Structures are given as C-alpha cells and as structure tokens.
UniProtKB/Swiss-Prot annotation:
PANTHER family: COILED-COIL DOMAIN-CONTAINING PROTEIN 40. Signal peptide: none annotated. It comes from Chlamydomonas reinhardtii (Chlamydomonas smithii). GO terms for biological process: axoneme assembly. This is Coiled-coil domain-containing protein 40 homolog. Disruption phenotype: Short and immotile flagella. Inner dynein arm (IDA) and nexin-dynein regulatory complex (N-DRC) components are absent or severely reduced. Radial spokes are attached to doublet microtubules with an irregular periodicity of 32 nm instead of 96 nm. Asymmetrically dimethylated at Arg-246 and Arg-523 during flagellum resorption. Probably methylated by PRMT1. Keywords: Cell projection, Cilium, Cilium biogenesis/degradation, Coiled coil, Flagellum, Methylation. The gene is CCDC40. The lineage of its organism: Eukaryota, Viridiplantae, Chlorophyta, core chlorophytes, Chlorophyceae. Residues 33-175, 232-269, 311-397 form a coiled coil.
Amino acid sequence: MADPMDQPSTSDPVDNQIFGEQGGLRPDHPLLRRAQEALKVQFEANRTRLQEELREKANALKQAKARREALGVELYGFQQNLAKLQLNLETTHQNYQCEDQLNQLKQQLSLEEGDTKGERSRRVCVCVCRVCCRIDTLQDNLKGTQQQLALVSAQLEAQKRETRAALETLAEAEVGGCVRDEALSAIQDGMREQQQQELSLVLEIEGYKKDVVREQLKHESLTAVVRKVEGDAVFVQKQIEGAQERQARLQEILAKLAKSLEHTEAEGEADAVDRAITKVAAEGRAIEEEMLSALSDQTTAEKATSKTAADTQELRKRIRAEELAVVETENELAKLQVDILNTEAHNSRLGETLGLLDEELRDKGRTIEKYELEIKRRNDEIEKKTREIDILNRRRDCRGSAALDTRPLQAPPPPQVKSDLALTTPMYTPPPVPQPSVGMTVTTEKLVSDMEKALTKREIISVKGRATAAKSKSSTPAGSATASSRASPSASVASSTLTRNQLDRATTDLAKSIKDLEAGRYRPVVEDAAAVGEELGRAQDKLGRVVALLEGLRQAAPHLAGELDKVLCHVADVRA
C-alpha cells in the first residue's frame, strides 16, 4: 500500500503559488519571464516591420496616384491636340471647296466674256449694216436732188421769161415765206427745249438706273453673305452635334476605362494584401512553431503552454481582422478620391466647352442680326429708287403724249401760185410719230418669260425643300423642325432675290427699249394705220397675261406682295 505522502497534493500552497487553477504556470512566474520578454521583442519587431511595410505601401499608392493623374493630364493634352488637328482638317477642306468654287466661277466668267464679245461683234456688224444702208439712202437722195436741180434750173429759165407774173408771185411768196419762217423758228425753239428736257430726264434716269444697279449689286453681295453665314451656322451646328456625339462616345470610353482601372487597382491591391497576409501568416506560423518548440523545451507543463498558445492565436486573429478593416477603409477612401478628381476634371472641361459654344453662338447671332438690318436698309433704298423711277417714267410718258399732240404749223400757199411754189421752195416734212416698236414687244415677251422662269424655279426650290425636309424628318425626327425652319428662310431669300433680279433686269431692258424708241432707232411695227387697232388688241392681250402672271406670283410669293402691288399699280396707270 502506497504511502499517501508520495501522491501529489493539489491543496499544497506551494503548488498553488507555482501553478494556476487550470494546472498551468502563472503569467508572473519567473520561469515564463524570459519567454514573455522574447515574445514581446518578437511582436514589437513584427509590428515595426509591418508599420514600415504599410508606409511603403502608402508611398507606392501615392506614387501610383500621381502617375495616374499625370497620365490623365497627358491624355487631356492629347485630346486637345486631336481637336485642334480636326479643326485644321475641316478648315483645309473648306479652303479646298472654296478654291473649287472659285475655279468654277472663273470658268463661268470666261464663258460669259466670250458671249459678251460675240454679242458686241454682232452689234458692231448690225451698226455697220445700218450705216451702209444710210449711205446708200443718202446717195439715192443726192441723185434725186441733182435731178431736181436740173429741173429747177430749167424752170428758172422759164420763169425769167415770165418776169411780171413771177414778181407778183415772188412778193406773195415772200410774205408767206416770212410767216412760215417765223412758225418754223418757233417750232424749232420748242423742239430744242423739249430735247434739252428729255436729255436731262434721260441723264437723271441713267443716274437712277446706275444707283439701282449699284444697290442691287450690294444687295446681292449681302444676300450671298447671309447665305454664307447661314451655311456656316448649319455647319457649326453639325460640328456641335458631331462634337457632342464624340464627347458622349469619349465619356463612355472614359467610364469603361475608369471602371477597368478601378477593377484592376482593386484586384492588384487585393492581391498585394493577400500576399502580405499570406507572408505574415507564414512568418507567424514559423514564429509560433519556433516559440512552441522553445516553450516545449523550456517548460514541462503542456497545459500552460496550450493556454498561452490559444491566447496568442486569438490575439493574432484580432490583429489580422483590424488590419484588414484598415486596408479596406483606405481602399474605399482612395476610390472616392479618384472618383471626385475625375468628376471635377470632367465638369471643368464641360464648363469650358459650353462657355466657348455659347460665346460662338452669340457671335453668330449678332452677325446675323447685323446682316438682317443691312438687308432691310438696302430693301428700303431699292424701294425708294423704284418709286422715283416710276415717277420719272410717268413724267416721260406724259411729255411723250404731249409731244405726239403737237404738229408743225404751215400756212397754205395761194392757189394761183401752188405749182410755182412746189418748184421753187422746199417743203417742210414733219418728223415721224413714234409708234409701238419691236423692242417694246420683245421686252414684254421677255418679261413674261422671265416671270414664268421665276415661278418654275420657285416651284422647283419649294419641291426640293419639301423633299429634303421629308427626308430629314424620316432620318432624324427630333431635328426636323429645326432643319425646316432653317431651310425655309434660305429658300424664301433665294426666290425673292431671284424674282427681284429678274424684275430689275426686265425694268432696265424696258427703259432701254423706250429710250431707243424715242431716239428713233426702231422702225414701226405697224405701218398701216388700219392695222393699229388689231396690234393694240394683241398688246392688250399680252398685258392681260402679264397681269394674270403677276397676280399668280403675288399669291405664290406673299413676301413680294409690296413690290408686285407697285408693279400692278403702274400697269393700271398705263392701261388708264
């Protein structure tokens, strides 16, 4: 039977001082002091090393952020250079188009110069033919005059033999000649005054015509400038739309790149953290193994060792959880900072682009308003010149009708000496009365044809405009209203300019024909007085067709109602 004193006693106070309640060594036991100091030194070294690695990771993260910002700035610079190159390309393309248009205009100018030279040569030939005919007529008149001179000389010899009768006849003839000379001098004075007045009126009309042509050229140049500005506005709008589309695509690409970059950075950071965690865990496991082996060698109490190891593992788990939470928080903060920087940069670029576009649109609007005011002023001046020309035409018509009513006075010779006076004194022949000429008819027909061409061109333009509007509406429903509103003013301006140019050209041709008619350059259309009524009826029918055409043009083009009303009033005055 064993001695009870040989068995270990758990109630011994010495054992209680050495071992704890669970059978392990107490933490403040001298045997564990060296182990605890060694563990403390190892933990502090690990903590210092982890802090240094954390600083290195933070520095690497800052450097990566700086490189990313530098890449973003460089990408923005490349985008600016790309935009400048695109603008230069578009400017070069516009220059090439302008050069092509200039070459076409030069070719057209050469063709028109050839036509003008041909027309001038034809007119020179016509003038030469007229001069030749005039010379032949004068030669025939000279021969007739020489024959009359021979007859007069024979009659003079016969009259010398009849002295007494001739003296009485001569006295009566002298009295009648004085009366006729006085009447002739009065008529010649009146004709000279009338010619001077007509010459002054012709000079005034030519001055007004030159002013009208000058204003018309200015108006056409302004119209061309307005068309160019409208084309530039359409082109700028297309560029804005293209830029917006490109900006949207670039934003989508940038968003995708940002997402991919964030995903890549997150994966890289996660991989780095995983590698660091794995490395730390491996080192910790190695340290634990070394520590456990050292503890197992130094102590004999397994329970105390297992308790200390369990506490150490729990402490390490807590440290790992805290470190992971800190890393995740830093990652979230870095992502938020990157998103904030990207958003601020994008907003600043959008603000600058929007400001530039607004300024450009304001400049275009001011330029268009200035051109519209200039066009209105030019139209007012043209209307004023047209009214003045109408007044001068009416004055000239009134003076022409007054000149037709005046006839030269001639005293009838005595019946006894009628045959003698026919042989001795030359008869005064009144000037021919101007009648409707071929130039007037041709000008009227030309005016009618120009009006028909203008209506045809206007219909073609309107049909093309509607077709373009329908096409644009089918292709882009959202921008159909804007396109139609831009196309309608340009079509109306083109049709109004075309009609005004044709009206001015027809008016100029009509004034030139009237001037040639007054100068006696045209022969009468109707030489027989009986056929004047028939020709007058034809002219009335043509005038009625012109009036109907003008009425249709006024209904088809309401923006020309004011000018067409003036033309219709003038036609009504001519009819009256």
